[in-house]
Amino acid sequence: MQHLVLPRSCIFVKMRGINRLKTWTGMVLMALLLGGCTPPDDPVVPMVPPSQVYLEVPSSFPRPDFPEDNAFDDVRWTLGKALFFDARLSLDGAVSCGSCHLPSRAFAAPEAVTPGAFGTTGNRNSSTLTNVAYQPYFMSEGGVPSLEMQVLVPLQEPSEMAHNVVTVCEELAAEYEAQSMAAYGRSLDPFVLTRALATFERSLLSGTSAWDAWQAGGATDPSVIRGAELFGGSGLGCNRCHAPPLFTSHWFANNGLDDWSEDPGRWRITGAPEDSGAFKIPTLRNIGFTAPYMHDGRFSDLDAVLDHYEVGGAGHAHQDSLLVPFSLTEDERTDLKMFLLALNDSAFVQDERWMQ
């Protein structure tokens, strides 16, 4: 299986049904041309002294990279948070970013597929935004090269928010005028909206789980230690795809699901047959909060996931060669689940910064 990094010139939207597969380059260009998304000639300087109170980087993590035209500060973060929870970003005024990415669920959702504007649904589960700042590309097929650009996808996708970024900014510009000017020195437009939302999302850093405390020298349950040995070490080799500390490799893999024809995943970007059914490997951090699992939310709990992997997948023609059958005793399964649940970060999901 090839692990490909998407060229920045190749941009595709996540479409929730293969019947709507299409490029979204035209959509982005229209937003850039009509919405004034290009940065001003002079660097934008916030109208208040920069503050970074709302950016808390875990001690074991590097500081996230921020684009030159979107350096972090609290004024931009505050604007981004307000937009994140504003349901008026959707055409029917009922769906916000926070409708599909709930803080209490580690910025995922409890449904297999969360309804979008007007109750429409697609075929993708809402992925967690945990540590999204470290992702090199976005969407499950890896078709979007930046977090700022990713914002345009759900906002304009018919089965999600079903709106138009230019229209949204025109409708909300007056209300957000003061915040937008303070944050970016200009009225709300696609440039401001995409960058403010990306700023908020880059602050969603989770690295204070029980596993992190153990790695820092703290005590932990012996079951967690045994589960960690199964996970990596001389055990199952799960860490080959879910490598610590982020517990993802940001690669793409076909994990052997049987029904892939309606959503071929990475194939949409590469067109390579071997990429049919391959999706970006998700982080396992906060896995206890992010059920249901898989790109389509088909598995309701961890036992269903382990059942799938224990038999070596469903035999997809292009499934990853790392998927081979294995057998766990009841005690081993308990230990492995204890380890996975040690990746939960309760402080993260209860953080008052995210509360509306």
Annotate each PLM feature.
Residues 37-356:
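Periplasmic c-type cytochrome electron-transfer domains
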Residues 24-35:
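Bacterial N-terminal signal peptides
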Residues 4-6, 15-26:
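Bacterial N-terminal signal peptides that target proteins for export
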Residues 15, 29-31, 340:
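Enrichment for repetitive, rod-forming helical segments
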